[in-house]
Amino acid sequence: TKDLVLIARHETELSDTTDVASRPEFVDRKRTKDVEGRMVTGWFAEDFTLAEIRTLRARERLPALRPANVRFDGLYQVPTFEEIVALAKAKEAERGRAVGLYPELKHPTMLMEQAGIDVVDLLAGALRKAGLDKAGDRVFVQAFEVAPLQRLNRLVEVPLILLISAEGGPYDEKNLRWADMMTPAGLAEIAKYADGIGPYMGHVLAADGTPTRLVADAHAAGLKVHPWTLRKENFFMAPALKNSGAPNAPGKLAEAVALLEQAGADGVFTDDPALVVPALRRR
């Protein structure tokens, strides 16, 4: 936020995940800005204080694909990172088992360049304050950028994951391309500052569902592999894993889980842990 509080949203632009666009008191905050080479119009978290963010209410980001979820629109506030840590610790005490955290640093270089906000330092400080900055703590930190992870590697001991998009390259390293970084030589470089990669699902499973070489090459470099994002809807599935029906109809989720396991993936990002975890346990 503008007053340097870490909050949890899918991106810094707020209109997809909150009701900010319907708030007349914030109409003057709407602007168009360059977000890593794309011109985006909307309301941005870095222009709001936490007190202002507190007045907003969350809403479903993908209502066309998940119409059932809109019944929750307007019920919840935007959580801070500190509140999520507190929730995880409360659930640990309640359930008697460890609960992990997997925060992502979104647009760290852009936020530093445009707003002077150092989210790397803020997150490192928040992890230390929570007692979650050591190698044995159940925390991974992920980012799509190189230099922020390199800095974080010097500030905390928790494992770090370099996220990899479908195409292009990291925003903070204009001369690097993801394709080159996924070669054995590129993966060896990543291993100097990160503990794993979080690749786009299509880099791990081809369109026909067969595994690529990426997991094996990453493991050879000593890296974990956590692909993203396994979602239940046809819309997000590889062609071989789609069922008949509309884009929001369920795809072949259990088969996707099996293929990822066969590929050797060490974990997976999912919007549907209530479906994916049982599928893993059945195997």
Ranges and model annotations:
Residues 1-283:
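Phosphate-group recognition and catalysis centered on beta-loop-alpha active-site segments
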